Regions:
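Extracytoplasmic/secreted envelope proteins and their assembly/folding machinery
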Residues: 77-81, 128, 132, 152-156, ...
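Bacterial N-terminal signal peptides
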Residues: 20-32
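An acidic, glycine-rich "communication" segment
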Residues: 64, 150-232, 241, 245-246, ...
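Loop/turn elements at helix/coil->beta-strand transitions in domains of secreted/extracellular proteins
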Residues: 52-55, 108-113, 136-140, 166-167, ...
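Aromatic-Pro/Gly-enriched surface loop or interdomain linker
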Residues: 36-112, 116-119, 224-227, 231-259
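Surface-exposed patches in mature extracellular/periplasmic domains of secreted proteins
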Residues: 90-100, 143-147, 166-174
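Short alpha-beta junction capping motif
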Residues: 56, 112-152
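N-terminal secretory signal peptides that target proteins for export/translocation
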Residues: 1-16
């Protein structure tokens, strides 16, 4: 395991930025014109070649509801990478991101991947095996944007086809992922953008089902931090929800890069 989150924070981020980050987020959400939007026709952008910089990776599943994997793409990536790039010293691609199918060998270059709308995700046996190997080799999976029992049941079946012996367990705010950069004091408060009845829950899967070992998968259930980040400049959602989405996403990336 890599050094503790507190030590890694000083490596990647300036402490002064951390103290004033709330003001920065409020100031930056978002003056720049939005170049891409879901109002425009969907277009899959070309992947950037691996060059050692952090690249946001989204997973494209080939079975399930058509195009569900692409929710919030690519504006969410642009907004998040802008925030992360301005607040950190990470070398990253601000204006480019990658989309990989689950069994793409190129995925092995990247330590973190994002999977959205898993309530429609049905991996093939080949995809499940490839994703399992990626996770077991050290990959960190972020799962986002699904709510209520029906979507949970689909996700759980798919996830257990990837990690058959996995136990999906509730996360506690004391876990290092919630203090990887931002100090998140509570996991209560956010809801899924589609309905305030869906109260956010955070769950995880640990290596060997052992909470003392590496967290392999973080699950945002009854939440959609991608949507909050995508539309953070439009005024559709409460600013505190957009800010919280950036905080969770930033912590996930820092944790994934340091564990």
């Amino acid at each position: 395991m890599m050094p503790a989150a507190h030590g890694m924070r000083s490596r990647f981020f300036g402490s002064r930025l951390a103290r004033v980050v709330s003001l920065l987020l409020l100031a930056m959400l978002f003056g720049a014109p939005i170049a891409w939007s879901q109002r425009q026709r969907f277009m899959l952008e070309p992947n950037v070649p691996y060059d050692g910089r952090y690249t946001f990776v989204r997973l494209r599943y080939t079975q399930g509801y058509r195009m569900a994997w692409s929710a919030d793409y690519p504006q969410m990536e642009r907004n998040f990478m802008t925030i992360l790039g301005d607040l950190s010293t990470l070398r990253l691609h601000k204006k480019a991101s990658n989309v990989h199918v689950l069994d793409d060998p190129a995925l092995n270059h990247y330590p973190i991947a994002y999977l959205t709308e898993p309530g429609y995700w049905m991996p093939t046996p080949q995809e499940a095996e490839a994703l399992r190997r990626w996770i077991q080799k050290g990959g960190f999976l972020i799962v986002d944007d699904f709510y209520f029992d029906r979507q949970w049941d689909v996700f759980e079946k798919a996830m257990l086809s990837v990690l058959p012996t996995a136990r999906i367990v509730p996360m506690d705010v004391s876990h290092p992922i919630f203090n990887a950069f931002f100090h998140i004091k509570t996991l209560v408060g956010m809801t899924h953008p589609a309905t305030p009845l869906a109260k956010a829950e955070y769950l995880g899967i640990y290596e060997d089902n052992d909470p003392s070992k590496r967290l392999q998968v973080i699950i945002n259930y009854n939440n959609d931090i991608g949507d909050y980040m995508e539309w953070s400049g439009e005024g559709w959602y409460p600013v505190n929800f957009s800010n919280d989405a950036y905080k969770f996403a930033t912590n996930y990336v820092v944790y994934g890069l340091t564990h």
